[in-house]
């Protein structure tokens, strides 16, 4: 298994597009692993700050990260994994009432449809369904 990572400069640009404040970007960078210009999530990432608790910003950070993972994916499996991450954030944003992030992901999904051909987040990207006996 490989550790999921993205190109740091691309992630920085994506975080700006998602409107993540600089102090949140710095906190995320401090809690992530950086090596050879690539950023990977810490295996047990946890926001232990007392003052940086805005769910909108943390959801935006994670959406930006997984959109970069999708963009850099080199296999169908990696694309499916990234889409699953984006889907999870989409439904988490909805459950937390963070409509802005839900709407931004919905727009991203619509814009990238020609690449992934999945009509909506509630549709599976898996092409071979498991058979249960």
List PLM regions with ranges.
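Charged, low-complexity interaction regions
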Residues: 69-80, 94-98
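Short amphipathic alpha-helical heptad-repeat segments
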Residues: 55-64, 79-82
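Short terminal alpha-helical segments
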Residues: 8-30, 41, 59-67
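Short, charged, amphipathic alpha-helical segments
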Residues: 80-87, 102-106
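Short intrinsically disordered terminal tails
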Residues: 1-4, 52, 115-133
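Amphipathic alpha-helical coiled-coil segments
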Residues: 88-101, 116
């Amino acid at each position: 298994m490989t550790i999921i990572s993205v190109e740091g400069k691309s992630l920085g640009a994506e975080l700006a597009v998602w409107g993540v404040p600089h102090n949140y970007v710095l906190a995320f960078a401090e809690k992530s692993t950086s090596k050879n210009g690539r950023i990977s999530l810490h295996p047990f990432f946890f926001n232990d700050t007392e003052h940086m608790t805005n769910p909108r910003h943390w959801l935006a950070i994670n959406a930006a990260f997984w959109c970069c993972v999708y963009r850099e994916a080199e296999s169908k499996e990696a694309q499916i994994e990234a889409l699953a991450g984006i889907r999870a954030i989409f439904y988490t944003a909805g459950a937390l009432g963070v409509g802005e992030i839900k709407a931004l992901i919905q727009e991203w999904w619509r814009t990238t449809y020609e690449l992934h051909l999945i009509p909506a987040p509630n549709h599976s990207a898996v092409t071979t369904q498991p058979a249960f006996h």
